[in-house]
Amino acid sequence: PLLLTLVVVTIVCLDLGYTMTCCNQQSSQPKTTTNCAESSCYKKTWSDHRGTRIERGCGCPQVKSGIKLECCHTNECNN
């Protein structure tokens, strides 16, 4: 019984470390994803001398003015 209890506790603990899948490709590159410890994904959009730039990743960072930030909370929501 003790061993079974330890196995159940281990499984429950491992499930608590759920990771989210966020897109992490830049601008118009082919879609790529990464597993994140954060519970959100972001998409930053801004314009510079090269045109419209897009950065994607994990979390929800603070941005400077002039940068559009979208944060979301489902897998691959920042594509």
From Swiss-Prot:
Q: Which SUPFAM superfamilies match?
A: Snake toxin-like
SS bonds (residue pairs): C22-C41, C36-C58, C60-C71, C72-C77
Q: What does UniProt give as GO cellular component? A: extracellular region
Family matches, as Pfam families: Toxin_cobra-type
- The answer to whether keyword Ribosomal protein applies is no
CDD domains linked to this entry: TFP_snake_toxin
Q: Which family does it belong to?
A: Belongs to the three-finger toxin family. Short-chain subfamily. Type I alpha-neurotoxin sub-subfamily.
Main role?
A: Binds to muscle nicotinic acetylcholine receptor (nAChR) and inhibit acetylcholine from binding to the receptor, thereby impairing neuromuscular transmission.
Please identify the protein, giving its name as recorded: Short neurotoxin 2
Q: What is the species listed in this Swiss-Prot or TrEMBL entry? A: Hydrophis cyanocinctus
